Amino acid sequence: MSSFKSKTPSLPSQAVGASVDRDQAVTSNVTDTISTLRWSPVASYLAASSWDGKVHIYDVANDLTAKGVGVIDAGSPVFTCDWNQDGTIVAGAGAGKKVYLLSAATGQATSFIAHDAPIRSLRFVKVPNAPLDIIVTGSWDKTVRYWDVRNTGSPLATLTCKERVYSMDAADGLLVIATADRHIQLVDLKADPNNFKNSTTNDPLKHQTHVVTAFPDGKGYAVGSIEGRAGIKMFPETSSDNSFTFRCHRHEAPAPKGAAKDVTKTVDVWAVNDINFHPVHTSIFTTAGSDGCIYFWDRLAHARFYTFPRREGAISASAFSRDGRVFAYAVGYDWAMGYAKNSPTYPLKLMLHPVADEEVKPRKG
């Protein structure tokens, strides 16, 4: 596998800096770290699931002012959320083993028990000859289940995974599931819902998978790990594909004062918490990490060309709006440094960044 063309991939301060002067903080009553951010596919509504036991929904105006317009109260930490294809339903799930559904039109909320252990991820997906609103849920009970929201009495199908589901994403017929022990399961959603075709491969990275994100066209996926590395994999795999791995959220620590020139260098390694592809310029993607950094990359050029100024806390979640003009990101404690480093004064923010053309347009040459 190849790597990104960057002389100093672990030194974001030497990359071209994205301006955050116009970033807007969302006034919010979120009281704990945001776990997932998802934009409506049809409007400027943003859903934010949180460890505070709620999914908060915001209406974002053109000037990036935002107001709360709805809440799902799950009563226990919510790890994931998503919108259905026409933006009429918001779903959330997490520690309570239930899926919660909120109708955007009526404000009515319903729920159903979906798994025997916490639900780590859910996505609305398209499958052949099936109703519009199919939810796929991935759980620590080592299963992925498919649900028709009109009839949640039993799943349409169940896929047994090799280990606990840690991350999951879907786009254009491809479902990517990352589990414990670095297994990646790839599911062809265009197959018969009762006979989903899937294959299992190993994560190209050496340490535990933290996040997977499908390409917008379903022809591959990105993966990030706890070791400050990420990778790009094509689907289906071929002998001449463009898969590669690269370092990202790593920082060389300054040498102790008076240290010899040949002293062994120390590198701080941070988890990759989230990866997002731009919906218009689909070769462009972002990585967000425990180090408080956000990077913009071009997977075709193998180049990193923008980085945000390092934020004051970990970036726990991020997402592009449906037109790619707004990039939402959350700052909050992600437990990467353990219990001892948590504090009531740790930053807790939801930010909206207006995306400049030069940040996302692929560069020629």
Regions found by a protein language model. Name each.
Residues 1-365:
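WD40-repeat beta-propeller superdomains and closely related acidic/aromatic-rich repeat-like regions
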